[in-house]
Amino acid sequence: MDIRIALAGNPNSGKTTLFNALTGSNQFVGNWPGVTVEKKEGRLKKHDHVIIMDLPGIYSLSPYTLEEVVARNYLIQDRPDAILNIIDGTNLERNLYLTTQLTELGIPVVVAVNMIDVVNKNGDKI
């Protein structure tokens, strides 16, 4: 039986970079929002029974943009087994709004703080 894990988070938070590392894929990564506008599926390296879904970057589950519609529909209709919420450590307040919405879906959520090197470089702490 397959395990389905969705990568969710704000635009430009590192979801696709993590997706590529986990799956061995080579999806395009850009340093601006809106690069991923559709969901991408891959299998975890050395664990073929784990499906990783790279969702478009979104700020909320309110379906105002195409990216939010794609991500929301997958999370609510397809209901993955777990959500890996990638958040940008340099802007926690903006990122945690989506985190709150994700936890309300009743799906297990793991929060991964990304860009911690930039946080440390700025002299900040989490």
Task: Label the model's feature ranges.
Residues 42-47, 70-126:
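Conserved C-terminal guanine-recognition region of P-loop GTPase G domains, centered on the G4
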Residues 1-65, 78, 82:
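Conserved G1/Walker A P-loop phosphate-binding module
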